[in-house]
A protein has these predicted regions:
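Residue-level detector of Asp-centered blade-edge/turn motifs that repeat once per structural unit
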Residues: 60, 118-119
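C-terminal segment of classical bacterial N-terminal signal peptides
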Residues: 17-27
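Structural motif
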Residues: 76-85, 131-141, 184-195
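Acidic, small-residue rich beta-repeat scaffolds with periodic aromatic anchors
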Residues: 29-57, 71-74, 143-207
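Bacterial N-terminal signal peptides that target proteins for export
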Residues: 2-12, 20
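Short glycine-/Asp-/Thr-/Trp-enriched loop segments that recur within the blades
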Residues: 103-109, 159-164
């Protein structure tokens, strides 16, 4: 075989090798799942999901913004499996924040639903367990603009749990959620209506 023929053969083999390396099998081309509060069967790359953005909730009057950020603890879950809530002014100053992460990413909480009250005085959000614990329970938290404080909604309804992540406002700051009719009766839900301004005023002072 002549020199030119051998050189041509080497070039052909090199091109074939490059083609086989470029044609990655379809499963490897699948995008890494980065949202949706999902557990993963295998760990995602540590550098994955770096472009995931927070959920931003501007208050109706535009003075405040509530951010729900993914804390990205476990690679065996989407980064939004646990959350951090930050309240900021429209100028970017941080008013307060609250973390719901756990050391290994399986005993914290993620935010399900969130909404400002129509009068912009309260920000309420419901959560679910990152590890699937007590799947019937959806703890709710309330931020008070006047108090600059985040408090559990259950403290405003005699320690009762909230049994649904859904809620709505009936008035400027009157909240309607769901709890149980009697302790332990998970299938017997009843609505509970709370005036958040009155309820916050009755809470003990924070440390």
């Amino acid at each position: 075989m002549g020199l030119d023929m051998r050189f041509a053969l080497v070039i052909c083999l090199a091109i074939a090798g490059l083609s086989s390396a470029t044609l990655v099998p379809a499963p490897a081309l699948a995008e890494v799942v980065c949202s949706g509060h999902k557990l993963l069967s295998s760990p995602r790359p540590e550098s994955s999901c770096s472009s995931l953005k927070p959920r931003i909730y501007p208050s109706p009057d535009g003075a405040l913004r509530a951010l729900v950020l993914p804390v990205d603890v476990s690679l065996y879950a989407t980064p939004d499996m646990e959350s951090r809530v930050v309240i900021r002014t429209s100028n970017g100053d941080t008013v307060t924040s609250k973390d719901y992460l756990s050391p290994r990413g399986t005993n914290g909480y993620y935010v399900v639903n969130a909404k400002w009250s129509p009068d912009s005085q309260f920000f309420l959000y419901s959560m679910a367990s990152s590890g699937g614990h007590s799947p019937w329970s959806f703890p709710m938290m309330v931020y008070s603009r006047e108090k600059k404080r985040i408090a559990p909604f259950s403290d405003m309804i005699d320690g009762k749990p909230t049994l649904s992540a859904d809620f709505h406002f009936d008035g400027a700051h009157r909240l309607v959620a769901e709890t149980w009719k009697a302790p332990g009766s998970l299938d017997d839900k009843v609505p509970v209506t709370v005036d958040l301004e009155d309820a916050f005023g009755k809470l003990p002072a924070s440390d």
